């Protein structure tokens, strides 16, 4: 059987919450320490994956809330420094980080990765993540804010 679409790109996921050997794992069997995450990223790059999705969270969303969690931007920047080809799709939740700081972090990651970043705007997501940081806006308000965020980013870049 031949692949009819040679332009298909495959992506993977950086498990900033930790990881298990199979779906449905109750407790992280592999914590999200840098050595493990680097192994995941380098394996994906060796297998010619196109990109890696990195979520943005303020507490562990897969396992216990107090379980270890790797911070998105620091982790992505460190992993970009040890890879050559694979891209990083960073999930951004407008309102979690001030726009000016986001622009600086994205510019730094763009420079370190030599342009291998993409941005995934996530105005919805897990309500508890927003409430955890004192954000009680409804989803429609967050979608409006996402539109403003994107417009401001376009002006900055």
Protein language model features and the residues they cover:
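Conserved catalytic cysteine-centered active-site region
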Residues: 83-90
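Flexible, glycine-rich active-site loops centered on histidine and acidic residues
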Residues: 8-30, 35, 95-157
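Hydrophobic residues within beta-strands of alpha/beta enzymes
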Residues: 52, 88, 117-119
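N-terminal beta1-alpha1-beta2 module of alpha/beta enzyme domains
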Residues: 1-82
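Short His-Asn-centered micro-motif
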Residues: 55, 91-92
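Short gly/ser-rich anion-binding loops that grip negatively charged ligand groups
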Residues: 62-69, 92-99, 139
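Active-site-proximal glycine-rich helix-loop-beta segment
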Residues: 48, 84, 113-115
